[in-house]
Amino acid sequence: MPELVFFSGTMDCGKSTLALQIEHNRSARGLQGMIFTRDDRAGEGKLSSRLGLVTDAVEVEDGQDLYASLVDHLSQGGRADYVIADEAQFLAEEQIDQLARVVDDLDIDVYAFGITTDFRSKLFPGSQRLVELADRVEVLQVEALCWCGARATHNARTVGGVMVVEGAQVVVGDVDQADTVGYEVLCRRHHRRRMTSASARAAALSPDVLPVQQG
């Protein structure tokens, strides 16, 4: 039976790499897929990974009906044995509903990839809807690490290396350009303390010490 599968995780856990691997494995067996993406770091109409791999994709626009787009593709003689939706957290809730309809009405597997929460630890609407509708939610097993070495569970937005907790939910940044808007994965402890790798280096911090209560 076709499924809607949501592969989730923090940044740096290999979501886009897995999406590209699924595309490679299926195309090697003669299957053809439709790849949707939104706001990829490599630019419009691209699916890329941090390992440098990249392929062409369909850039999703605001208000675009993904089900109708796929039906139009098929009606014009196109083929789609599966659908990949990368950066799915940026999709609107109704677009996630449309992907579910692709599975149910067209009998086509849909593989969605995305991060679950934003830099404030709030669910992205697209990710929330995927959790609600997906036949399976797979948490990727490649663990991203916080600067302290602990498992990273939260995504932080930084400006000049300083963590910020206010601003628009979606701002495309770069993990390699610390002087602009960037992103970093942190463990919960250091996300709560707003302690990025840059701020930790600047303060030359020793291991965390619990506060001493005087009484």
Give, region by region, the residue ranges found by the protein language model.
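Conserved P-loop
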Residues: 1-74, 118-129, 142, 170-173, ...
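Residue-level preference for the first positions of well-ordered beta-strands
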Residues: 4-6, 32-34, 81-84, 109-111
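A short acidic, amphipathic alpha-helical/loop segment
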Residues: 22, 93-102, 126
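Walker B catalytic acidic pair
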Residues: 86-88
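Catalytic P-loop NTPase motifs of RecA-like helicase/translocase cores
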Residues: 90-92, 119-120
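Sensor-1/coupling segment of RecA-like P-loop NTPase cores
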Residues: 103-126
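Short basic (Lys/Arg) and small-residue
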Residues: 134
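Short recognition patches in nucleic-acid-associated and regulatory proteins
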Residues: 142-175
